[in-house]
Amino acid sequence: MNIYMTDEGKLLTEEQLKLVEAILVYTATEEKIEANSELSVTFVTNDEIQQINREWRGKDQATDVISFAMDELGEDEIDFELLEDEPVVLGDLIISVERCREQAAEYGNHFERELGFLAVHGFLHLLGYDHIEKADEDIMTKRQEEILHHFELYRGKL
């Protein structure tokens, strides 16, 4: 899987970026995602994610992660999955590094654990997981924890 990460504000260290990439590659492998799939991940500030949230979701507040799935076709859009040998574009993840730091402190987690959680959580949304219904939430939560535990990222381990 090809992952394109953007951190223009230099909000993360090289090690943290590599951790996110490793977590996403592992998740893609575990979820049996095609090798020619593509995903973009952008790391932003609270102000930047608030602007995106306002423009695209109509919510004028900062949030931790936003997922934009590419499989939701609009009118006159091409279904790229029908094009042989073309990469499967899964979508975009936008992660607020500031909100990640705030939540890590609030929940008593290492920053890297919260960062990994947000990456996995957003990615699983792109893959069709959801948490609106309790049963779906339980499935998604279990999957997230399995993936994070593989990287020894546990809750409340400061």
Swiss-Prot record:
Q: Which InterPro entries match?
A: MetalPrtase_cat_dom_sf_prd, YbeY, YbeY_CS
Molecular function terms, GO-annotated: metalloendopeptidase activity; RNA endonuclease activity; zinc ion binding
Required cofactor(s): Zn(2+)
Q: Which Pfam families match?
A: YbeY
Q: Carries keyword Hydrolase?
A: yes
What's the EC number here?
A: 3.1.-.-
Q: Which residues bind Zn(2+)?
A: 121, 125, 131
Q: Where does this polypeptide localize?
A: Cytoplasm
Any Gene Ontology CC annotation: cytoplasm
The answer to whether keyword Oxidoreductase applies is no
Keywords from the named record: Cytoplasm, Endonuclease, Hydrolase, Metal-binding, Nuclease, Ribosome biogenesis, rRNA processing, Zinc
Give the cofactor note.
Binds 1 zinc ion.
Gene Ontology terms describing biological process? rRNA processing
**Alphabetized HAMAP family for the sequence:** Endoribonucl_YbeY
Family note: Belongs to the endoribonuclease YbeY family.
Job description of the protein: Single strand-specific metallo-endoribonuclease involved in late-stage 70S ribosome quality control and in maturation of the 3' terminus of the 16S rRNA.
UniProt protein name: Endoribonuclease YbeY
Q: Which organism is it from?
A: Exiguobacterium sibiricum (strain DSM 17290 / CCUG 55495 / CIP 109462 / JCM 13490 / 255-15)
